């Protein structure tokens, strides 16, 4: 059988790394600082969503007028907080099972990119902390779209722009940890690998019908998957 090259699209938070609640807290701090109103962001406020949509939703709940200037000031402050505080925090950690899976995918000759709700600058800070940023030639980020369902299509387009390589949706694999990740893969006709880090989310993800669903990525058989 001839080798079939796939494009694996990796999510960051909850998949490759755990931010340890640090980035969520810093984003809330940035919104609070620039609006003057105290904001708390819980797990369900951020998991599976883009940075921009998280902030928009928070501002809507506060009845704040959303302007491009306000969003820019919030994110610029957020970036500065991430640079100064995330990089030195001991709370974030890497999920070794996913890094091992990334190794397996790349060693098998497949292509990889990022598919994340993070702003590009934030994604870079998070991954450089664990020396993972250089593993990816490109990604699709929150600046590109606030609609996660659109991200696989943008990744396909970017693969051509960067590598001059074409992948059909059936030869793309979304790797994530949330219902939104599963939906983005399945509704675009991609294969979907979901690692469930929150046991209470299992049933909701399982209903989506991903190709693989488990609590630890060590058990994935790459040959069976692709």
Where in this protein do the model-derived segments appear?
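Active-site neighborhood of HAD-like aspartate-dependent phosphohydrolases
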Residues: 2-47, 53, 60-61
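Short, acidic loop-to-helix structural element flanking the phosphoryl-transfer center
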Residues: 4, 9, 84-114
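Substrate-recognition element of Asp-dependent hydrolases with the DxDx(T/V) motif
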Residues: 98-128, 140-146
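Histidine/lysine/aspartate-rich catalytic loop segments that bind and position anionic ligands
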Residues: 128-159, 165
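Short acidic-hydrophobic, aromatic-tinged amphipathic segments that line or gate anion-handling sites
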Residues: 140, 211-219
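Conserved Lys-Pro-Asp/Glu-containing loop-to-beta segment of HAD-superfamily phosphomonoesterases
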Residues: 153-182
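Acidic, Mg2+-coordinating phosphoryl-transfer loop and its flanking beta/alpha structural elements
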Residues: 174-214
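Short amphipathic alpha-helix with an adjacent loop that forms part of the alpha/beta core around
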Residues: 220-226
């Amino acid at each position: 059988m001839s080798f079939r090259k796939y494009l694996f699209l990796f999510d960051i938070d909850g998949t490759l790394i755990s931010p340890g609640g640090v980035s969520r807290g810093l984003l809330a701090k940035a919104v609070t600082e620039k609006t003057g109103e105290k904001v708390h962001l819980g797990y369900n406020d951020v998991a599976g969503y883009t940075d921009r949509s998280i902030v928009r939703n928070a501002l809507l709940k506060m009845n704040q007028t959303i302007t491009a200037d306000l969003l820019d000031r919030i994110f610029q402050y957020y970036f500065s907080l991430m640079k100064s505080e995330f990089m030195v925090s001991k709370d974030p950690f890497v999920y070794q099972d996913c890094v091992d899976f990334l190794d397996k995918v790349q060693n098998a000759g497949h292509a990889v990119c990022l598919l994340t709700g993070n702003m590009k600058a934030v994604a870079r800070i998070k991954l450089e902390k664990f020396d993972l940023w250089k593993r990816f030639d490109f990604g699709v980020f929150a600046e590109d779209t606030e609609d996660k369902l659109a991200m696989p299509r943008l990744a396909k387009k970017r693969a051509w722009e960067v590598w001059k390589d074409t992948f059909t949706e059936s030869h793309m694999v979304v790797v994530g940890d949330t219902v939104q990740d599963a939906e983005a893969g399945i509704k675009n006709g991609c294969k979907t690998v979901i690692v469930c880090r929150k046991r209470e989310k299992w049933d909701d993800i399982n209903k989506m019908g991903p190709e693989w669903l488990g609590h630890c990525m060590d058990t994935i058989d790459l040959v069976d998957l692709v």
